């Protein structure tokens, strides 16, 4: 829904931050809703930046839910404490929104190193509130999941093992529970790419991704069963292509207002060297 965010994380492939101005306008939101009305789209995944900072965010969530669409929101948790965010956890619970929260570590030092001082304590406080509203209780009614990205230019550890570590440590230290954890490899784009260049490690990291290619990941790639809608309504195969400006091929719809789902069947997906991040090791889904 835009690049504006209350945080300025070092690994952010969107290069989001408090000063970013790119925001989805109401007209584009209405185009998204029109597509949901016309098609049997089962779910919508809302992201940013911090999508909650878009003034049309709650309208999109409520309208999508009213249409029977599964709504997933990617949140950084700390946005709960920003101005005008009062009642946000209750809004999520009242609409049975699935939450996928970014939490790069289960320790304060690990989180604050990536997201800034105080981010961890705010995240834990937000998670406690969500647990109190029934999120992450294992019933599946209010799902709470985490996203993990490595803190540097290396591949993440196995997802199952890391999920066990997160569940054990967050429960032991803070009484926090959640449903699942998703592991993503850092994309060599956006702000993370800038850091790689600054540290003279871009070529080394790209080579590591290519050496770690795993053909078994291809069946589960996100670009094969989703479409990414940019803040301006332009269409992409995935969120990462969106950041790079790699829109759908000219033979397919290029803007959400033109979207015909049937025309996307069997489409050719645009790829480039950054795609190795999704196919490296255990893969990213």
Task: List each language-model region with its residue ranges.
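Residue-level signal for mature regions of secreted extracellular proteins and peptides
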Residues: 2-5, 216, 268-271
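Conserved alpha-helical substructure of the radical SAM core
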Residues: 2-48, 52-69
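Short cysteine clusters
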Residues: 5, 9-12, 223, 238, ...
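Conserved phosphate-coordination/catalytic loops
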Residues: 23-27, 121, 269
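A generic local structural motif
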Residues: 30-32, 84-88, 262-264
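Conserved AdoMet/S-adenosylmethionine-binding subsite of the radical SAM
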Residues: 54-184
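A C-terminal junction/extension of Radical SAM enzymes
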Residues: 138-238
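Flexible mid-to-C-terminal extensions adjoining Fe-S/redox cofactors in radical SAM and related proteins
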Residues: 234-285
